[in-house]
């Protein structure tokens, strides 16, 4: 496929990314956090009006929705409610005595240079760098690896607040132009402009209301996908419908773009367009959500329609990796839950004519990239990356040796390339960029960051535990070396468990304040993810979703049973689908945790499909519109399962511009929780203003949010921090 890439935003999500990193640097003096008894600040929850008349009917089930009015996030009364909730939350946080110390430490350890792997486009190399505390990474380029480094786009200069991100979404085949995608305030909406690479000047081409698209260049323009212009005031909440594919010719207004594909019968389908590297075929992928997708193709032209279906239905996932010598090379899970690579002649696409290039293995084939006329196949073996090199006949030539257990990514390039680049990271291994010589099979360090703590102080273990139904699950445990298993360690348990997503070892400085203060950071591998293939995914989706919650609860019970921690010192966290995970587990087992952090979570399982792109999650969750699924969803929907009982200290996090998981989910959940909390622990919501779902959040905001979360956790565990 045509090589396209996006800048790697150095975004350290407060709960998603993981621990540790290296360098012989100044070390903060700490010991284990001291047990103390803090006095809870006095606070009063804002009054939240209940509309007793708001009731929805799902078949034979009537469901009260008293906080429905909070769904209108642009309404004056909702904005006032947001201000009142934030006033209570930040008033509480302001009274935590060590909050500033944690923020200062985070600012110190964030201040290190980091970079992405370079992407080669003709003679140019593009990459991002962040000098340390820059709000957004800067996109650089140079002509040749030893050429002069120049700034291509500096988001920090274009937006002083640091809330805009920029990335290359496609480079023209003559390497003269780059299409740039801009996202503001964390929104999924993308504004596409074009820059001439040599002069680094904008051409004036401007494309609005793009979402989930790259730019596939062809001749003097490119193919892309967009939505119709949304109604004013509904840009961040209205359901997105009729995703269409267009061709934009350089120098013409968007209104003159040529419609290439639309589906008037299926208004909720996504449509993405690509181009094979040899420019012979347009490849259209259609999806109804996050399950699988159809693949269609046609010889390249600018006519509407005319596509031939290669893979039909949305039950499988297949993507064309390359087209060479008249064959499509396809990465697919058809008849291979752990995926395989096959060669398909488009004139004889029937399955009996396929040629297996890389057969299915007992381990998950996590992806296949091409560079220098080779396939780079990435496998997951017990949630750790292993990469093997194959020729186009399927002969395995070598393995790319990794520094240890961790996660590798990259290995993209063009057929004529003699080198490729990749990144490697782990919990205690800072993200390092390697250059790989395709001819010799040798790797060398290209960029290694220097961080302000010693990774040798920490250790990583992978343990296995048993879930409720007997399923065996792995979990990573990160801590200082020699930590005592006495049940008194402040512990944060994180997981995701959904959408076939792989949660693999990664690197972040966010967890350092926990580890430096004698804490433990744990990442549980749950069903619903993709770490062990499609069967593992299916075991945690739709009517099997309870398995995910059971896996997470079992992980917590394991940590308590093995005395890593206890109920008094255990916090749980997750974001997005992981926010749903935390919401469900804290309503099912409120007795098991001391602190809960549901972040940007899907909390109303009866209505999620009615907002923005929520309809795309129906294949994963099911729908309240389905008579076979609505009662199951209602049975675990966090908003609908808050009882009049004692709940742990909870800080919900969301953002007012989140157009992926709209903030109404979190608003309604916290309103219900504040209403029904029978204990004394605080139930607060931290609402980020002028921010979105998380991607591209400015470094300054990340530091503030992470500091607030650690402060809230340590304070409610009665643990002091040992920073001077």
State where each predicted segment sits.
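Active-site-proximal cap/loop segments of hydrolase catalytic domains
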Residues: 523-724
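Beta-propeller blade signature
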Residues: 141-142, 193-197, 239-251, 296-300, ...
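A flexible loop/linker signature enriched in serine peptidases of the S9 family
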Residues: 130-137, 159-163, 182-191, 206-211, ...
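Bacterial signal peptide processing site
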Residues: 21-24
């Amino acid at each position: 496929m045509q090589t396209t890439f996006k800048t790697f935003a150095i975004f350290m999500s407060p709960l998603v990314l993981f621990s540790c990193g290296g360098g012989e640097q100044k070390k903060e003096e700490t010991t284990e956090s001291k047990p103390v008894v803090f006095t809870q600040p006095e606070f009063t929850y804002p009054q939240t009006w209940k509309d007793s008349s708001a009731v929805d009917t799902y078949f034979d089930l009537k469901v009260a929705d008293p906080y429905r009015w909070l769904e209108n996030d642009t309404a004056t009364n909702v904005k006032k409610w947001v201000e009142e909730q934030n006033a209570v939350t930040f008033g509480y946080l302001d009274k935590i005595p060590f909050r500033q110390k944690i923020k200062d430490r985070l600012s110190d350890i964030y201040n290190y240079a980091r970079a992405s792997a370079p992407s080669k486009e003709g003679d140019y190399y593009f990459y991002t760098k962040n000098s340390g505390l820059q709000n957004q990474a800067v996109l650089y380029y140079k002509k040749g690896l030893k050429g002069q480094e120049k700034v291509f786009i500096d988001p920090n200069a274009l937006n002083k607040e640091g809330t805009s991100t920029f990335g290359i979404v496609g480079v023209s085949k003559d390497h003269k132009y780059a299409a740039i995608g801009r996202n503001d305030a964390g929104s999924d909406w993308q504004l596409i402009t074009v820059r001439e690479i040599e002069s680094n000047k904008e051409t004036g081409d401007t494309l609005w209301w793009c979402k989930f698209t790259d730019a596939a260049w062809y001749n003097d323009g490119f193919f892309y996908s967009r939505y119709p212009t949304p109604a004013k005031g509904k840009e961040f909440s209205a359901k997105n419908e009729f995703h269409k594919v267009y061709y934009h010719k350089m120098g013409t207004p968007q209104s003159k773009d040529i419609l290439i594909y639309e589906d008037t019968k299926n208004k909720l389908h996504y449509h993405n367009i690509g181009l094979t590297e040899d420019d012979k075929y347009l490849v259209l992928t259609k999806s109804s959500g996050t399950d699988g997708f159809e693949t269609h193709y046609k010889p390249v032209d600018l006519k509407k329609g005319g596509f031939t279906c290669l893979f039909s239905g949305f039950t499988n996932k297949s993507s064309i990796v390359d087209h060479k010598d008249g064959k499509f090379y396809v990465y697919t899970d058809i008849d291979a839950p752990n995926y395989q690579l096959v060669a398909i002649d488009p004139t004889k696409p029937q399955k009996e004519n396929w040629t297996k290039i890389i057969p299915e293995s007992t381990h998950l084939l996590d992806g296949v990239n091409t560079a220098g006329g080779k396939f780079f196949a990435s496998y997951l073996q017990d949630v750790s990356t292993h990469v093997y090199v194959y020729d186009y006949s399927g002969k395995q030539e070598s393995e790319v040796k990794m520094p240890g257990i961790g996660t590798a990514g990259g290995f993209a390039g063009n057929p004529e390339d003699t080198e490729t680049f990749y990144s490697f990271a782990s919990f205690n291994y800072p993200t390092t960029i390697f250059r790989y010589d395709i001819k010799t099979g040798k790797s060398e360090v290209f960029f290694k960051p220097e961080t302000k703590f010693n990774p040798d102080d920490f250790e990583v273990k992978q343990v296995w535990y048993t879930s409720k139904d007997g399923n065996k699950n792995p979990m990573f445990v990160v801590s200082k070396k020699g930590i005592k298993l006495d049940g008194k360690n402040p512990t944060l348990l994180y997981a995701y468990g959904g959408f076939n997503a792989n949660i693999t070892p990664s690197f972040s400085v966010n967890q350092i304040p926990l580890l430096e203060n004698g804490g433990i950071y744990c990442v549980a591998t749950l069903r619903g993810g993709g770490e062990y293939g499609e069967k593992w995914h299916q075991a945690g989706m739709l009517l099997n979703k309870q398995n995910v919650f059971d896996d997470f609860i079992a992980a917590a019970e394991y940590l308590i049973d093995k005395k890593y921690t206890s109920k008094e010192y255990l916090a749980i966290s997750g974001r997005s689908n992981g926010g749903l995970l935390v919401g469900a587990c804290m309503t099912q087992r409120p007795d098991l945790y001391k602190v809960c952090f549901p972040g940007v979570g899907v909390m109303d399982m009866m209505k999620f499909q009615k907002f923005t792109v929520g309809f795309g999650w129906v294949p994963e969750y099911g729908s309240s519109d389905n008579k076979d699924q609505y009662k199951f969803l209602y049975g675990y929907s966090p908003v609908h399962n808050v009882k009049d009982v004692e709940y742990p200290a909870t800080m919900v996090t969301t953002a007012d511009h989140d157009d992926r998981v709209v903030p109404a989910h979190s608003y309604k959940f916290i309103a219900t929780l504040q209403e029904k909390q029978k204990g004394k622990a605080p139930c607060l919501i931290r609402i980020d203003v002028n921010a979105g779902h998380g991607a591209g959040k400015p470094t300054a905001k990340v530091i503030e949010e992470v500091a607030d979360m650690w402060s809230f956790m340590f304070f409610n565990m009665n643990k002091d921090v040992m920073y001077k």
